């Protein structure tokens, strides 16, 4: 697996996030910044993806595909950047058609783009609600049995870190709000029609007295099970580059502009 392990959003990253937002009340807001994973502290460098490892028999090593390093960026790259002169190519994501288990929208097709849509729906539900119990409910409904345990799932750990450092117990308190909007995505790897590694870049806004904003990149392996895409990562995926959407750096990191089918 990759050397960089996903970690909960850290307090240290919040200071970076809030540096240009608000100094008054910073002690309270230390829990409200959305941190880039602590592992992403190295100097920016370009990773050239290697070909998938194929053991004897021609089978793809899925763990290698999941852990294949991606472009490493600085934490500040999630907070802003100059718009690119040439916009990135679009990735058209199909619409959901119904509400599925744990009240997460579903009905996405059996395509890599469908897996992108499903992962985004799972991520939006967990991070916008910021509720530990709900995060556990979504994990039970949407993570393949035997895959990443609930206490190691990145989304659960982010919810715990956010609430704990903000002094909230178990869920968002009245007056606080988090919005999560997908802005870009990429299909990192595929192995047949039923298994893919997809990544979603979201625009996250947290409001508690003042508004904070950042970009957050997130990857998972997704497997087609029982007529729907489910999270199937056995462990940590490679750290996804959290880059400000629409920048040259975002394009270099492989992000394609989010486009909803029919719009």
Regions found by a protein language model. Name each.
Residues 2-8, 17-25, 233-263:
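Long, positively charged, glycine-interspersed low-complexity recognition regions
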Residues 11, 20, 107, 127, ...:
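Conserved aromatic-histidine-acidic binding/catalytic patches
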Residues 1-85:
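Amphipathic, hydrophobic N-terminal targeting peptides for secretion and organelle import
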Residues 69-79, 92-97, 154-158, 172-179:
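Short, mixed-charge, low-aromatic patches
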Residues 3-6, 132-219, 224-226, 236, ...:
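Structured, amphipathic secondary-structure segments that form assembly/contact surfaces
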Residues 58-60, 64-65, 77-97, 215-246:
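Short beta-strand edge/turn micro-motifs at domain boundaries
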Residues 86-163:
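Core segments of small alpha/beta cavity-forming domains
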Residues 60-74, 85-91, 148-151, 164-173:
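Short charge-dense sequence patches
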């Amino acid at each position: 697996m990759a050397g960089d392990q996903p970690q909960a959003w850290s307090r240290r990253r919040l200071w970076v996030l809030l540096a240009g937002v608000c100094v008054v009340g910073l002690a309270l807001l230390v829990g409200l910044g959305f941190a880039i994973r602590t592992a992403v502290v190295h100097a920016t460098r370009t990773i050239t993806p290697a070909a998938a490892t194929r053991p004897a028999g021609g089978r793809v090593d899925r763990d290698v595909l999941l852990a294949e390093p991606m472009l490493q960026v600085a934490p500040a790259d999630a907070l802003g950047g100059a718009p690119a002169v040439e916009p990135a190519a679009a990735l058209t994501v199909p619409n959901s058609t119904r509400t599925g288990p744990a009240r997460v929208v579903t009905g996405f097709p059996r395509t890599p783009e469908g897996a992108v849509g499903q992962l985004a729906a799972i991520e939006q539900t967990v991070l916008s609600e910021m509720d530990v119990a709900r995060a556990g409910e979504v994990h039970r409904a949407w993570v393949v049995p035997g895959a990443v345990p609930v206490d190691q799932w990145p989304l659960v750990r982010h919810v715990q870190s956010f609430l704990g450092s903000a002094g909230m117990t178990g869920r968002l308190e009245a007056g606080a709000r988090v919005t999560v909007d997908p802005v870009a995505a990429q299909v990192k790897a595929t192995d047949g029609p039923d298994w893919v590694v997809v990544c979603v870049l979201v625009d996250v806004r947290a409001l508690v007295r003042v508004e904070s904003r950042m970009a957050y990149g997130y990857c998972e392996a997704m497997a087609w099970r029982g007529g729907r895409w489910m999270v199937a990562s056995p462990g940590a995926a490679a750290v996804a580059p959290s880059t400000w959407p629409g920048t040259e750096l975002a394009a270099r990191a492989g992000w394609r502009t989010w486009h909803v089918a029919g719009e």
